């Protein structure tokens, strides 16, 4: 099994209480911790406004961070979960990703999706097209990006994008461009796009849903004549880990108090949300949960530690006791 680590960027109120001028140092240090450790990749979210409610807390922009992490790290791969196609022209996005791929020595992962956060869309002047239109934009955008990365030029007279001889030089270091991660579990459109283009998928990691979405994806692959085994299936997990169950409860208490300071009305709800996840417990319990997920076909876990900006002990415990236990199944 392979592992990715989310670096807190503020979107989930995970830099609250840290002065904005000091937040980059926190993010950089965590990226470098991952770079020295067993993590294959680091990730940020492509969002502009905080969740679970919109606040004035800082949220750092994903692709700016990609460039900064490219310069600050040496080994770890760099991903976004996931870039919203509607937020940037796809030719421009392909150019940005290609440049960062060069800066990083070929370490970019291209997470891409149709987008969902209506408040952001409207606030930034993008409107909010219905889901079918957003997913059609995703499909056209992926076509443009693949052309640019393969050939250095692209044209598309699409319904949503009109690209006329866009040039992308230098090409990405990775032949054909960064691997595409198509995120989301929409069964008619998103998973069809994944079956067409994705090297990786990312959808709900809870057992019943993961199995069902995998079956839908496999069906699309069969219809398209694609080998389902070519696609690596990943999932995102909130991790709450501690040496003992009593200390896990303490960690959950910390989460509740953290949200009480920044969003009091959400404190109990957030504690419950984190407590209900599959990766909550001692290292042994989390290893068991991940082994069960692996049996379903989930071979790439991307892990979020809400306390990471303030306390790295959970990350370090996961590195010591969880990753090695699953190392024999890496691939």
Model-derived features with residue positions:
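N-terminal beta1-alpha1-beta2 module of alpha/beta enzyme domains
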Residues: 1-72, 176-178
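Hydrophobic faces of well-ordered beta-strands that scaffold small-molecule active sites
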Residues: 3-7, 42-44, 77-80, 108-112, ...
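An alpha-helical appendage that flanks or caps ligand/catalytic pockets
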Residues: 7, 131-172, 204-299, 309-313, ...
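Active-site mouth loops of central-metabolism enzymes
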Residues: 9-24, 83-91, 175-186, 272-284
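Acidic (Asp/Glu)-rich catalytic clusters
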Residues: 35-36, 66-75, 97, 101-107, ...
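Alpha-helix-loop-beta-strand connector modules within alpha/beta enzyme cores
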Residues: 56-79, 137-144, 316-331
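Internal, glycine-rich beta/alpha segment that forms the wall or movable "lid"
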Residues: 86-197, 211, 215-217, 229, ...
């Amino acid at each position: 099994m392979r592992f990715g680590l989310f670096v807190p960027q503020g979107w989930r109120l995970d830099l609250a209480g840290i002065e904005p001028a000091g937040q980059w140092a926190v993010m950089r240090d965590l990226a470098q911790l991952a770079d020295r450790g067993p993590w294959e990749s680091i990730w940020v979210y492509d969002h502009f406004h905080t969740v679970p409610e919109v606040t004035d807390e800082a949220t750092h922009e994903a692709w700016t961070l990609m460039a900064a992490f490219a310069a600050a790290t040496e080994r770890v791969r760099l991903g976004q979960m996931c870039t919203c196609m509607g937020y940037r022209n796809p030719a421009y996005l392909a150019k940005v990703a290609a440049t960062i791929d060069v800066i990083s020595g070929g370490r970019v992962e291209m997470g891409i999706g149709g987008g969902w956060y209506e408040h952001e869309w409207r606030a930034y002047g993008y409107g909010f097209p219905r889901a079918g239109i957003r997913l059609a934009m995703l499909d056209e955008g992926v076509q443009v990006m693949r052309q640019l990365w393969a050939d250095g030029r692209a044209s598309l007279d699409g319904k949503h994008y009109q690209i006329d001889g866009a040039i992308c030089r230098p090409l990405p270091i990775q032949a054909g461009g960064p691997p595409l991660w198509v995120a989301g579990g929409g069964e008619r459109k998103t998973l069809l796009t994944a079956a067409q283009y994705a090297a990786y998928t990312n959808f709900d990691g809870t057992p019943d849903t993961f199995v069902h979405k995998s079956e839908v994806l496999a069906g699309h692959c069969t219809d398209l004549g694609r080998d389902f085994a070519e696609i690596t299936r990943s999932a995102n997990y909130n991790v709450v880990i501690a040496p003992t169950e009593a200390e896990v409860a303490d960690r959950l208490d910390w989460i509740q108090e953290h949200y009480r300071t920044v969003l009091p009305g959400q404190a109990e709800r957030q504690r419950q949300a984190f407590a209900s996840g599959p990766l909550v417990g001692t290292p042994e319990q989390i290893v068991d949960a991940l082994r069960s997920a692996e049996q379903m076909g989930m071979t790439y876990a991307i892990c979020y530690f809400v306390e990471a900006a303030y306390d790295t002990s959970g990350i370090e415990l996961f590195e010591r006791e969880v990753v090695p236990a699953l190392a024999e199944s890496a691939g």
